[in-house]
Regions:
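Short, charged/polar, Gly/Pro-enriched secondary-structure boundary elements
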Residues: 47-51, 61, 114-116
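Short glycine-enriched loop/turn motifs at secondary-structure junctions
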Residues: 3-6, 62-66, 100-101
Length: 123
């Protein structure tokens, strides 16, 4: 029997791979690990990857996608600091301003393709 690993790849579909790669490089503040004309990978840590993909040679744009990209920081203070930093960056679209939820401080960002990115403190 094959041992199933923990999920280690988060992949989202994008409409403009180059624009999205630049966007996430700015957002994450580090360079991609792998770059191709249709697929870009950012190494999150030694195990997990975050990837963006155009959907292949003939991407299917009609498929709905329901998900949220999560960035967990250590403390509410870090969430507040990152919110201020990103709020000042004209290239980052704050979708929902900083607020307190059951898990602590959080805010939402939308990427160029409308994917929602939630920043919050670790549960």
């Amino acid at each position: 029997m094959i041992k199933i690993r923990k999920p280690n790849l988060q992949l989202i579909y994008v409409s403009d791979i180059q624009h999205s790669a630049e966007y996430y490089q700015n957002l994450f503040n580090f360079e991609p690990y792998f770059v191709s004309p249709r697929y870009v990978v950012f190494k999150v840590d030694g195990v997990a990857d975050f990837a963006i993909w155009s959907g292949g040679e003939s991407p299917e744009h009609e498929s709905p996608r329901f998900a949220e990209i999560g960035i967990n920081l250590e403390t509410d203070t870090e969430v507040k600091e990152l919110y201020k930093e990103w709020k000042a960056d004209a290239g980052i679209n704050i979708y929902k301003d900083l607020y307190t939820d059951v898990f602590g401080e959080t805010f939402l960002v939308k990427d160029p393709d409308g994917h929602v990115i939630r920043v919050s403190s670790a549960d």
